[in-house]
Structures are given as C-alpha cells and as structure tokens.
Amino acid sequence: MSVEQAPVQRADFDQVMVPNYSPAAFIPVRGEGSRVWDQSGRELIDFAGGIAVNALGHCHPALVKALTEQANTLWHVSNVFTNEPALRLAHKLVDATFADRAFFCNSGAESNEAAFKLARRVAHDRFGPQKHEIIATVNSFHGRTLFTVSVGGQPKYSDGFGPKITGISHVPYNDLEALKAQISDKTCAVVIEPIQGESGVVPADKAYLEGARKLCDEHNALLIFDEVQTGVGRTGSLYAYQHYGVIPDILTSAKSLGGGFPIGAMLTTTELAKHLAVGTHGTTYGGNPLGCAVACAVLDVVNTPETLAGIKAKHERFKTRLEQIGQQYNLFSQVRGVGLLLGCVLTEAWKGKAKDVLNAAEKEGVMVLQAGPDVVRFAPSLVVEDADIDEGLDRFERAVATLTKG
C-alpha cells in the first residue's frame, strides 16, 4: 500500500529542522550519473559529489543493484552476529591495503573516533596511562563528535561546548620541524590528512609524511591517516597513502566508500587490532548488510586499473580548464589538489568570496563546493563523463564571466 506524501518546500526546513545547516534554495529530487534535477525539473551538473561522497555519481546501476538485492535479503542483525557482506567487504579492504583488520561504523567521524580510541588504548596497554597525547595539525578536520572536534584544529567547530578532550596539541600542516619539536615519548599518535580537504584542499608534501612516519617510529607513536575524503580512488590511487608511498598504522575511510550510503571503516594491523577486545568499542549499526553490500560494489568498480587511470586523466582535464578560467578572469591564483579533489584558490581581489562563486555557479546549473572562504572545491564523481566535465565547466565559466563583470 502506497501512502501519498505531503508536498514540502525549502521553507519547511526553516520551520521543522534544527538550524545547524543553511541549505541551498533548491531541493534536489532526482539524480542520474553526474546530473541532478530539482523540484522544478531544472537540471544541474554535479561537481560537488555530496562533498566527495558520490564516488560513482547518482544511482549508478551497480550500486542500485547491490542495494536492491540486499534490501530484499537482510537489513540488520546487530553485532551480536556477523553478516556476509561485512566479511566480503573486510576481505576486499585488507586485500587492497596494508591492513589486516577492519572495523565498520557509519561515518567518517565515527571512523576517526575509533582510530583515536585505538591509539590511546594501544599506548595505555603497552606503556601506561602517561602516554596518551595526540598531535594533530592546525586547520584539520576529523568530524563533529567531541573527541574529533577536539582533535580537529579549528576552534570555530570546537569552542562553546564546554571542556574539550585534553592531551591534544596542534602543529602547522606540512611543517616537519614543528612536529619534531612537539612529539615526545608521551605521544601516542600523530594524526594527518594526506590532503587537508575542508581547509582548502592542501596536499601534504611527501617529505613531510615520510618524516612523520620516522618520528612516530622513533617515539613509539602510531601514525594515523584520516582518509575520509581522500580514500577510495579520490586521488587516483585507492588510498592516498599509496600515492605517497608512506604506510600508516591506522587508516580511516568513509565518504566514497559507500558511494552515498552511510558507512565508515577503520583499517589497521592485527597487532594493533587485538587491543580492541570484546566490549572495548562498538556501534549498533556498524557493518550492517546494506552499507557493506553497497561498499563492496563501489570497490568493485573503483579499484580497477581502468577507473584509477581514468581519475588521473580527468584530473588533467579539470585542472587545465580551471587554470584557463582562473587566468582569463583573474579569479584563481592556483589550482591544486590530487586526482578528483581540486581546490581553486581565489585571487586577492576575490578573497572571502567562495560562496559568491558557488551561488553564481548554481544559477548557471552547476554544483560546486567551497573549502573555506577562499577556495572553490571540486569533488565530482570518479567516473564523470568527459562530456559532462566539458559542459559543466562551460556553465562554470559562464557563471564566472557574469560574476566578474559585476
């Protein structure tokens, strides 16, 4: 029996939702590939990807098939039992990475929460309670739980909620000397995003990551890579650590892993995983059959030589055109990033106006993101068609031309 749904509009958000978001004026109602349609039937090209989540675009046939088949089979059993999709997904991830063990949850924040708890637990078990300090970077972003905002180096997200988690310090990103000065035998973990996504799409220097690995080894600290945004093909490698050739002790993954379905994962070694014994950590929904079935399908499509090579080629297509647009209209001083995570840094004349660029782009029918007030971010589908790239950037250029005319 179908139930007729009451019509809703954007204005309803302001009446019934907690106001912690400020969504766009239009409501997307349908998506296919890299295209989205709103309530009025207007079509937009999606270069935002649900903030680097929709790895295969909208309603990819392989994901629809995986979700539909699993939805007709088994939804949820809790972690009192395991399930087949979770075990298949764990095998796929450990076979493709440095890791031996996987922990599944529902989001990037939960993945990082698990990683930070594991790091402290390992240090506690091996060295005692005095070894509990975590070093993160300024302007990092690791999630919105109290622990993850405390580790994240952005006061705008962590201030105003009472005492933060203690034992956490922050050093400038890509500054190995600052890390060297801060790390000590009390450090249990160093947490790094291989590319700082929310803070401007800033890639790490290879020497910085190599140096961090060496310092962690010298001080018996664990190296955690937060790959929530960079993982699952986003950089043209399955995970960014493979792009850099630096192996962490713990890796976190989410966003693209589910291709739009909520799932997170923490990956680590057998030796470290044993410290999370029965009862030390958990999540009711983590590793549910639906999410794991979809994630298996995502990996089957993304983790192929053809798809990963295509991401690198599409990077060049985006970057070349964005640099041309930036130069022609004096809008971007730099286009940076790896794979299909690109950040366009606004010139001095346009500093602080990333949201204006987003709004102008939306009016021309293209969805993009910002990464702070000074950077326009692109995180499209990893399998976006070249024709969609070209048409989307044509629309984006029209938006820029209109905006810069004033």
Swiss-Prot record:
GO terms for biological process: L-arginine biosynthetic process. Pyridoxal 5'-phosphate binds at residues 108-109, 141, 226-229, 284. Its cofactor is pyridoxal 5'-phosphate. SUPFAM superfamilies: PLP-dependent transferases. N(2)-acetyl-L-ornithine binds at residues 144, 283. Homodimer. May also have succinyldiaminopimelate aminotransferase activity, thus carrying out the corresponding step in lysine biosynthesis. This is Acetylornithine aminotransferase. It comes from Pseudomonas putida (strain ATCC 47054 / DSM 6125 / CFBP 8728 / NCIMB 11950 / KT2440). The lineage of its organism: Bacteria, Pseudomonadati, Pseudomonadota, Gammaproteobacteria, Pseudomonadales. The gene is argD.
